[in-house]
UniProtKB/Swiss-Prot annotation:
Pfam families: AIRS, AIRS_C
Documented EC number(s): 4.2.1.-
Residues recorded as bearing S-cyanocysteine in the entry: 341
Reaction it catalyzes: C-terminal S-carboxamide-L-cysteinyl-[HypE protein] + ATP = C-terminal S-cyanate-L-cysteinyl-[HypE protein] + ADP + phosphate + H(+)
InterPro entries documented for this protein: HypE, PurM-like_C_dom, PurM-like_C_sf, PurM-like_N, PurM-like_N_sf
Disulfide bonds: none
Name of this chain's protein: Carbamoyl dehydratase HypE
Keywords: Lyase
Gene Ontology molecular function terms on file: lyase activity
Biochemical pathway: Protein modification; [NiFe] hydrogenase maturation
Protein role: Involved in the maturation of [NiFe] hydrogenases. Along with HypF, it catalyzes the synthesis of the CN ligands of the active site iron of [NiFe]-hydrogenases. HypE catalyzes the ATP-dependent dehydration of the carboxamido group attached to its C-terminal cysteine to a cyano group.
Record PTM text: Modified by HypF, which adds a carboxamido group to the thiolate of the C-terminal cysteine, yielding a protein-S-carboxamide. The carboxamido group is then dehydrated by HypE itself to yield a protein-thiocyanate.
Enzyme class: lyase
Amino acid sequence: MSRLDLRNGSVEMVHGSGGRAMGQLIEELFARALRNEWLDQRNDQAQFELPPGRVVMATDSHVISPLFFPGGDIGSLAVHGTINDVAMAGARPCYLAAGFILEEGFPLADLARIVESMAAAAREAGVPVVTGDTKVVEHGKGDGVFITTTGVGVVPPGLHLSGDQARPGDRILLSGSIGDHGVTILSLREGLGFEADIGSDSQALHGLVAAMLAAVPEIRCLRDPTRGGLGNTLNELARQSGVGMQLVERAIPVREPVRAACEFLGLDPLYVANEGKLIAICPAERAERLLEAMRAHPQGREAAIIGTVVADEHRFVQMETPFGGSRMVDWLSGEQLPRIC
């Protein structure tokens, strides 16, 4: 049997049949790129030891369009997104599983590029992909490739971060500028050209989280503002904790190209997706120390204290404008940017 034609070949239905062709796809493409001691065993599952602590599991499905974009692709995004979901519990991400839905006719060169990007992201993060699965659907029944990743991590004993832990008086911190990922994807999709000055912020944040917890173990909540952006995520946290939030608009970092693109497109950057930022809520007396720790880390250099948790039975999120007024930051109504991750 000849080797896979990774330059000119494409995915065929036989690649999902469970036979020799599927084995060849796994061996010559997936296993070669993602190689590690668990995958090398060629079992249908991975067996591993975990350090002491509570086990955290998160799963995420990725349907982003386009598949490739400045700052990443669906492969690296699948790794980063799931690692970040695990890390927001304060956990150390340990292992990943990946499932691929491939469309018949999808170029093998593009698939190889995606898998190699996934492998590079996993290596950089130190979180291996230890098991996986591949299915093929008929041409026209998919959209190239969809990826589902599941992550397993461990929370150290004594640590408990949750979205229901915010208390009145706490400070709200943001790790950096918002809207980069969403504007990049929309601009590329519509051929607007803004992505040349921006690029996705997709990155794994567990290193930043570890540095933050080492400095301020009293952190109450962590959350990454992905779909729905900062505005939706803060409403989620307010609802979970039964509190209100008061933001300061001028304190929220937004890069000028993102601000300009949002004004042109009629978007509010508060609701534009991010893939490499986090929100932290901590006691007021520890906020400056946490800010210092975040800014000392490469992924938190633009960090800012953006608001305060307040007592509010209605659980409203409100924002002070630069002109001294106040406006409601409500839940996003409808879908502002579909297939953003």
